[in-house]
Swiss-Prot record:
GO molecular function, one term: mechanosensitive monoatomic ion channel activity
Lineage top rank: taxon: Bacteria
Name assigned to this protein: Large-conductance mechanosensitive channel
HAMAP family, alphabetized: MscL
Stretches that traverse the bilayer: 10-30, 76-96
Principal subcellular localization: membrane
Topology term for the membrane: Multi-pass membrane protein
Record text on subunit structure and interactions: Homopentamer.
Keywords: Cell inner membrane, Cell membrane, Ion channel, Ion transport, Membrane, Transmembrane, Transmembrane helix, Transport
Locations listed in the record: Cell inner membrane
Name of one Pfam family that matches: MscL
An example Gene Ontology CC term for this record: plasma membrane
InterPro entries: Mechanosensitive_channel_CS, MS_channel, MSC/AndL, MscL_channel
Amino acid sequence: MSMFKEFRDFAMRGNVVDLAVGVIIGAAFGKIVSSLVANIIMPPLGLLIGGVDFKQFSWILKPADGAAPAVVMEYGVFLQTVFDFVIVAFAIFMAIKLMNRLYTKKEVEKPVAKPSAEETLLSEIRDLLKEQNGKAQ
């Protein structure tokens, strides 16, 4: 089997294609959440705290020295990233919870199958044999 054919077979399996679609949608969803946090959630939150822009929160570890730039720890950007993570994690949690609920409903709604004619006959034979063995003793 040629390497190209093996790769094609691998890439066209359902799981790989589904995974690729999931990664692409996840990346797009991540951008939406980042925009939501940076442009919608953080500005009003900063306003409530007193007109604070979280992106400006930083510690200067070493000031700029001539041509060397300052060494800065930008914890405000980190806080925004934490908000991004919490929102994405909550959205994934809700999606999984919904999927689990739908899955359990399908299991509950599954009707109990009636025994086949063969199973019914075998059950009757078993019961008769038990009855005969009980009388013999």
